[in-house]
């Protein structure tokens, strides 16, 4: 069975944000504005996305 993937794009800067939110961005593999990564749709990834929802956009692939 194929796992779902999510396309996550950073839309805002991490400068001046909480350290936990910066760590979540790094955990997702995002390093700069307009950087896009594809990640597996798991509960831990969803949790990181929910923490930084205001800095990222998410699409299902």
From Swiss-Prot:
NCBIfam families: rpmD_bact
GO MF, one example: structural constituent of ribosome
PANTHER family in alphabetical order: LARGE RIBOSOMAL SUBUNIT PROTEIN UL30M, MITOCHONDRIAL RIBOSOMAL PROTEIN L30
Swiss-Prot/TrEMBL keywords: Ribonucleoprotein, Ribosomal protein
Assembly description: Part of the 50S ribosomal subunit.
Protein name, per record: Large ribosomal subunit protein uL30
Keyword Ribosomal protein: yes
Ribonucleoprotein is among the record's keywords: yes
Lineage start: Bacteria, Pseudomonadati, Pseudomonadota, Gammaproteobacteria, Alteromonadales
CDD domains: Ribosomal_L30
Residue spans crossing the bilayer: none
HAMAP family: Ribosomal_uL30_B (MF_01371_B)
Domain of life from the UniProt record: Bacteria
